[in-house]
Amino acid sequence: MPGTLTVIWWRDIPAQVIAKDKRRASKVVLHPRFQVAIDKAASRAGKRAYNDYIGEWRRTQRRCGDDIDEEVAAEAERLEGDYDKHRLAMLIQSGGVDGGPVFAPAHDETQGKALDA
């Protein structure tokens, strides 16, 4: 029986891939550089309060095949390839919005973690 594949995003930055069918679920949390990018983008966008930050999460869903483990792995690999360091850096600068305006760096962002692969 086909399943449902879900990608969880903070604005336009992916964070997790989940697939479910009637009996099972499979999940991959993307590389830590995605969470670092989300945190930095949120800071740039002024989304420091929990309620501001949490309200920006969204899900996209599509049908997937029977092998949900393979579907999750393939989608995670695709996202990690599509969202390289350069693309994540651009999303950080725009506060997490693809093609959005560039925000000035937040003071605390310059002291954060590096965006390493």
Predicted regions and their residues:
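Short, charged/polar N-terminal "headpieces" of proteins
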Residues: M1-A25
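Residue-level marker of positions within ordered structural domains that often coincide
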Residues: V17, D39, D84
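Acidic, aromatic-enriched beta-alpha/helix-loop junctions
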Residues: K22-T60
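Charge-rich, low-complexity amphipathic helices
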Residues: K27, D52, E56-C64, S94-P105, ...
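Helix-rich interaction surfaces within compact, conserved domain-sized segments
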Residues: G46-M90
